[in-house]
Structures are given as C-alpha cells and as structure tokens.
Amino acid sequence: MLRSTAMAGLAVSMLIQPDYALAEIITGNKLHEYCQKYDARQFVYGYVTSVVDTSKFACVPPGVSVGQLADVVCRYLSNHPEKRHYDAASLAFGALNASFPCPKLPAAK
C-alpha cells in the first residue's frame, strides 16, 4: 500500500512540474512566454546569465544586473515577433550584443 501511494505521489509530482524545469532547446517564442510569467522570471534570469557566461563575445559592462539583461532580452523578443521562431540563445545573444556592443578594435597596421 505504501509503495503504491509513493508511486502515485511521484507520478502526480512529475505531472505538476512547471514546464520551464525541463531541459530542452527552446525557441524565442517559449522564452518570450516565460518573460510574460512572473513565476518563470527566475528561469529567464538563469537562461540569460548562461548565454552571457558561455559567450566569448559578450561585452556586458560591469555593474549591469541580471534583471537588466533579462529586460533587454525580453524587450527584444516583444519587439521582434517575426524572429521568435529562432532558437532563444541566438536571439538573446543578438539582443545583448545590440544593447551592449563590443568596442571596435583598432585597425591593424
């Protein structure tokens, strides 16, 4: 009896897990959806942070908060619905690169 109750509890808990807890490659549409949900905001923060942390070309200045980074990405997704079918990481990087462009290197002599 105890085993069947535990199994039923496990099955129910798996069904009620938020969908943003799943590991998957997401599109801009899905990330935009998460941007709109208050309870998914921590996911957005983590996602955007991972984009910045894994990019060799991110030029985010010191002092910029994770909230600011998430706002930039979420605003970009809101303003560009025609691009939201692309993968979210590429869109997030593009949004951050547009808002925080890297300084231009001097021309080689």
Question: Language-model segments: which ranges?
Answer:
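Short N-proximal segments of mature Sec-exported proteins
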Residues: 24-76, 90, 95
